[in-house]
Regions:
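Catalytic Walker B motif of ABC-type/P-loop ATPase nucleotide-binding domains
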Residues: 173-177
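ABC transporter nucleotide-binding domain
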Residues: 191-280
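Hydrophobic anchor residue at the start of the ABC signature
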Residues: 162
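Conserved ABC ATPase signature
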Residues: 107, 148-152
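Conserved ABC ATPase "signature" region
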Residues: 115, 119, 127-144
């Protein structure tokens, strides 16, 4: 039986009217297409990174997916329903975490916030206890469950936000900048939780972030949006392999030499007997470069770096700006 998509957007568009003052009295209006003819299918169990530069259309798309904004064009269905017409029904089936907004009660202990959310989402006491027992262990919440939310550190609060979004066992989890401002330990805890959630329970994850390490550690698929249009969509390794056409080789030679000149490479720097070369793999291969160096001189040691995900994404942004 064919799987139905969790998110199905067809020709999705959102147009905003921007008013600008022209002189003391007159105003001019400009129409801005924030999202333009976007087609997106996300299937159950996928963990998808949704990335793009500021103003690319990420937040607008997320707001249409969650029923906050009305599309100007196209159709959107989430879990088989219209998010705008059946927003309350959708709310009980998805979890949402926005790094800059809270769904917790600031004056209440964290545990009390979870209890209130149980009633709002109409979760049975037994199901809630089972979920919370797992989440408390996964996110290491036990030491601050009785602490008022306003007294929590940013990292503690974000772990609490993630638990709050997951306590009702959503089929789809949407996260917008969940690790913004967090220390390394808290970031690692959030990423580990998202991986385990996806792998253990098959929860579909849609993650937007500017921290590309989040994408690299959590997501198997990347969708890149720019100027409201999807410019890349595919498995993360494929994206890196296809667009990461440059690698860096470091060679340590038996003697100090002038910069090596090898076809298909650019000499980056020399430090004593070590030299770094950037390899353009559209022109040559790492094996051919190493063989060419070996014909010129003796090699003591070498290392070869894989394409950097940050560089790949910057290349995508630059090509579509």
């Amino acid at each position: 039986m064919e799987q139905l998509p969790i998110i199905e957007a067809v020709g999705l568009g959102k147009e905003f009217v921007v008013h600008k003052r022209a002189g003391r009295i007159r105003r001019t209006t400009t129409k801005v297409m924030a999202v333009d003819s976007l087609d997106l299918l996300i299937y159950p169990g996928e963990s998808v990174g949704f990335i793009g530069p500021n103003g690319a259309g990420k937040s607008t798309t997320i707001k249409m997916i969650t029923g906050v904004l009305t599309p100007s064009a196209g159709t959107i269905r989430v879990l088989g329903i219209d998010p705008l017409k059946e927003r309350m029904t959708l709310t009980r089936r998805i979890g949402v975490v926005f790094g800059q907004r809270s769904q917790l009660w600031w004056d209440l202990p964290l545990a009390d916030s979870f209890g209130l959310l149980r009633h709002l989402f109409r979760v049975s006491e037994s199901d809630h206890k089972e979920s919370m027992d797992w989440l408390v262990g996964l996110l290491d919440l036990s030491t601050f469950l009785q602490t008022p939310v306003r007294q929590l550190s940013l990292g503690q609060r974000m772990r609490g936000e993630l638990a709050a979004a997951l306590a009702h066992r959503p089929e789809l989890l949407i996260l917008d900048e969940p690790t913004i401002g967090l220390d390394l330990v808290s970031k690692d805890a959030v990423r580990t939780a998202l991986r385990q959630l996806n792998e253990t329970y098959g929860t579909t994850v849609l993650l937007t972030t500017h921290d590309l390490a989040d994408i690299a550690e959590v997501c198997g698929r990347v969708v890149v949006i720019n100027h409201g249009i999807i410019v890349e969509d595919g498995p993360l390794p494929t994206l890196i392999s296809r667009l990461g056409s440059e690698r860096i080789v470091m060679v340590e030679l038996t003697e100090t030499l002038d910069p090596l000149r090898i076809a298909g490479t650019i000499h980056m720097r020399t430090e004593g007997r070590r030299q770094w070369l950037r390899i353009n793999e559209t022109e040559t291969t790492a094996g051919a470069v190493i063989a060419a160096i070996g014909q010129q001189t003796s090699i003591l040691d070498l290392s070869l770096s894989e394409p950097d995900f940050d560089d790949v994404v910057r290349r995508v942004y630059g090509a579509t700006s």
